[in-house]
Amino acid sequence: MRTSQYLFSTLKETPNDAQVVSHQLMLRAGMIRPMASGLYNWLPTGIKVLKKVENIIREEMNKGGAIEVLMPVVQPAELWQESGRWNDYGAELLRFVDRGSRDFVLGPTHEEVITDLVRREVSSYKQLPLNLYQIQTKFRDEVRPRFGVMRSREFVMKDAYSFHVDKASLQETYDVMYQVYSNIFTRLGLDFRAVQADTGSIGGSASHEFQVLASSGEDDVVFSTESDFAANIELAEAVAVGERQAPTAEMQLVDTPNAKTINELVEQFNLPIEKTVKTLIVKGATEEQSLVALVLRGDHELNEIKAQKHPLVADPLEFADEAEIKAKIGAGVGSLGVINLNVPAIIDRSVAVMSDFGCGANIDGRHYFNVNWERDVAMPEVADLRNVVEGDPSPDGKGVLQIKRGIEVGHIFQLGTKYSEAMKATVQGDDGKPLVMTMGCYGIGVTRVVAAAIEQHHDERGIIWPSDEIAPFTVAIVPMNMHKSESVQQFSEELYRTLKAQGVDVIFDDRKERPGVMFADMELIGVPHMVVIGEKNLANGEIEYKNRRTGEKQMIAKDQLLAFLKENVKA
């Protein structure tokens, strides 16, 4: 491709509204342009990268035995009503009515559509297992689109769905897809972790997220220093450390009128925060136990996903308001504790091993100090309620935990029969009876992968694509003052024709621009291999080569250039 015949839309300045690096660089590199909130036009440089990512995904999915299909973005409401998600999905589901007064949605996902398709096309257990995938546009009406294509309303996703006679068959395909995803992200050159995850609104049992490690990520990824354990922080088990020590002091009731938070209590009374507990009141799962107390160490954070899975706690988790708490317990939120508490309590594992701790007295403006289990108050039910922290023991007993930020680029689920049962998707089993199919689903955010690669691989000059396979161009020909030098022009044109004939994705900068502008643009869009052709070097039989990824520069003999590029260009 010649730049003179290309829409080369680079920007010198960073747009003010771009918050994260990937958004800034995708705008500056001329990859995307905003159209409306969370909606983007993909320009030629961007679409080249997007299609290359899609092709890698497609190749690896095909190798894993999946079969490509394509389903409509527009979906009839009846399917969502049949699955039960019409009322459950929330405002992210964009609903509309066609000219015939029929309800439709713009698909945020395709579980309903694929289940309907397969129940119509597959009738016998002999046709299973079956794994179908598509690469298709999705729409989720995000309340706050942000970070460019990282969290946009319209995006491209690869979603696959597998159908099975039983869970054992599902597990086999799930394991294959786990490996396929690992192959995809390895081939893309990304530093990622596959982590245990919560299934969320999709439903099902087992689930893994594929997280690209980046400081701009929205998720906390937990992994061990000495094993392959990795989990989303929502699912990482917090292991209690040590044994409960014997009491060393008598319990005291202390006036604390100005201490309404843990931090105020610690500051005013010079207490170690790890010797305090906080009591949170949430809605209970039943009318008989309408409020439940969750008790954590003062420096720990509640893990809401863990808490709402407890049978006593309402799902989704909902905190009680102050009026409810005051009416039931008789004290405000700043004075709550485990002594004389008249609602069921669940304490975190770390609280169960505490001794001589401080807590609210359930009397406004008062706290108990030096509280001990069994001696001063009976031990309530113990559960894992908190987020892990850096340095906690790994749940598998190997090493300690590290926590890094991650960008979720893929997610695989074992759905089970949630959708097939609701939508009566059955086949004839080997006994001749109807058999509800067991399902799995497997998603990759294709547009998000592009942004995640940039978040992880960039410098002050622009994008550094982690793999030649996804760079918009793999080789840039940058001729110095070509329009004033016949020898430079002749060699550049000949090299361009040769590389094109060899199938190399090459960009030839034939603009009448200053060399500095040409270098800056090629570095900004991240072309991995740059061939710089100057009149003086050419006369000496040499060509300058620059590697974008390593920063290396070297002189190559003119007659060795093609062999050098063949050896070093990976795509």
From Swiss-Prot:
EC number: 6.1.1.15
Gene3D superfamilies: Anticodon-binding domain, Bira Bifunctional Protein, Domain 2
Catalytic activity from the UniProt record: tRNA(Pro) + L-proline + ATP = L-prolyl-tRNA(Pro) + AMP + diphosphate
Molecular function per GO: aminoacyl-tRNA deacylase activity; ATP binding; proline-tRNA ligase activity
Keywords noted in UniProt: Aminoacyl-tRNA synthetase, ATP-binding, Cytoplasm, Ligase, Nucleotide-binding, Protein biosynthesis
Primary residence: cytoplasm
Protein family membership: Belongs to the class-II aminoacyl-tRNA synthetase family. ProS type 1 subfamily.
Record comment regarding domains: Consists of three domains: the N-terminal catalytic domain, the editing domain and the C-terminal anticodon-binding domain.
Record's protein name: Proline--tRNA ligase
Species assigned in the record: Actinobacillus pleuropneumoniae serotype 7 (strain AP76)
Gene: proS
